[in-house]
Amino acid sequence: MAPTFTNSNGQPIPEPFATQRVGQHGPLLLQDFNLIDSLAHFDRERIPERVVHAKGSGAYGVFEVTDDITDVCAAKFLDTVGKKTRIFTRFSTVGGELGSADTARDPRGFATKFYTEEGNLDLVYNNTPVFFIRDPSKFPHFIHTQKRNPETHLKDANMFWDYLTTNEESVHQVMVLFSDRGTPASYREMNGYSGHTYKWSNNKGEWFYVQVHFISDQGIKTLTNEEAGSLAGSNPDYAQEDLFKNIAAGNYPSWTCYIQTMTEAQAKEAEFSVFDLTKVWPHGKYPMRRFGKFTLNENPKNYFAEVEQAAFSPAHTVPHMEPSADPVLQSRLFSYADTHRHRLGTNYTQIPVNCPVTGAVFNPHMRDGAMNVNGNLGNHPNYLASDKPIEFKQFSLQEDQEVWHGAATPFHWKATPADFKQATELWKVLKKYPNQQEHLAHNVAVHASAADAPIQDRVIAYFTKVHPDLGDLIKKEILELSPRK
């Protein structure tokens, strides 16, 4: 039986396109609620887009534990090999707006919500293992340089490179970005990385520093700069189309999940800080350990309801998983939930895609607010009332905690020559793959050729610190693309 067409209060509407007016040619009547209702709702269809990661695609799936890591983490969804947990993953570009191209040279967001028996766990990752900053106060400044010039409203190569070359801790991520890894062939064919260091603990009270890797079972495939640019013009929704059509056809993408771990003692001996988001952990010294696999096997039924309204936050954790003292991660614990309250409202966790699978959110003092639609805990007192017993569930705590000593002090994590070491190692690794060093130099030169000459000179100097050969290649092509008088 077909549904009956109604207005917003459920009244049946016999003719949706008829309007009330005076005679055949007179003015419209304000009493025509069907028209006013329709226009008023249309005027409010759009909500604020994400300030970063605005353009995205999503799908549901399942995570399965493949290997026992209970010696590292006692989270319940990991307690049994073969145990399955429903998930929702959202992929995205970072800097572009909602209508931007999927193939832009940009990091890709890789956020996954695990609907566990102990609440929702959000793993809010990227497709690169490092990032541009390690000082959180730099984030708004950095993002502004990757977006539009406030005067011209155009992307601006001078802004882009001025920031990066004066904040040299960015160089490792910039090397990744301007390699062909910066233009993935699809969301299916890229990895995901925690980037940040987290703390996981077991039932013995022991804790570990952890890095997480999602390795694509489809392999890594990339686009050249020219292929990405061509697709941006011919099919800007290329990655969305690829993901949706493959899942619809039963070609379900999957990722195998690994961790790297460090003890506190190992972290103290490491040649870099485990809280430095611009560094990777060498696999030879801190080996990968498999723990699971997830598969995306279900497309959303409604993009706005399930993808646009999906809300992830690294503050959404479960027992035995917690953030480290990484300062950028610490700042994200606040900013992600804050932007969701701005975009979606204070009750954003009541939106179905964001609801815990248990449905058991019980916090008597968190009540009311715009769009509270879950019953608002009925007549239960809006505080912890002594005559209304509440269970406070206990779980094992870490016996050995981190200890911090010191006065409150301003700290700026300034760049040093050591920040070029891993970038130089990456440059040497690229030599093992055909044309990858040349592609990196070409991609940088094409982008930087749009900048003014003084900025170009800084770009050349920046990459020369990585390796003289890289600086020479970039200089040669920049001068060919933008000859100087």
Curated annotation (Swiss-Prot):
Gene3D superfamilies reported in the protein's UniProt record: Catalase core domain
Cofactor annotation: heme
Subcellular location: Peroxisome matrix
GO molecular function: catalase activity; heme binding; metal ion binding
Pfam families in UniProt: Catalase, Catalase-rel
Residue sites binding heme per the record: 336
Chief site of localization: other
UniProt superkingdom: Eukaryota
Listed GO CC annotations: mitochondrial matrix; peroxisomal matrix
Entry-linked CDD domains: catalase_fungal
Keyword terms: Heme, Hydrogen peroxide, Iron, Metal-binding, Oxidoreductase, Peroxidase, Peroxisome
Active-site residue list: 53, 126
EC number in record: 1.11.1.6
Recorded catalytic activity of this chain's protein: 2 H2O2 = O2 + 2 H2O
UniProt-listed GO biological process terms: hydrogen peroxide catabolic process; response to hydrogen peroxide
InterPro entries: Catalase (IPR018028), Catalase_AS (IPR024708), Catalase_clade1/3 (IPR024711), Catalase_core (IPR011614), Catalase_haem_BS (IPR002226), Catalase_immune_responsive (IPR010582), Catalase_sf (IPR020835)
Subunit field text: Homotetramer.
Family: Belongs to the catalase family.
Function according to Swiss-Prot or TrEMBL: Catalyzes the degradation of hydrogen peroxide (H(2)O(2)) generated by peroxisomal oxidases to water and oxygen, thereby protecting cells from the toxic effects of hydrogen peroxide.
Protein name as it appears in the record: Peroxisomal catalase
Species lineage: Eukaryota, Fungi, Dikarya, Ascomycota, Saccharomycotina
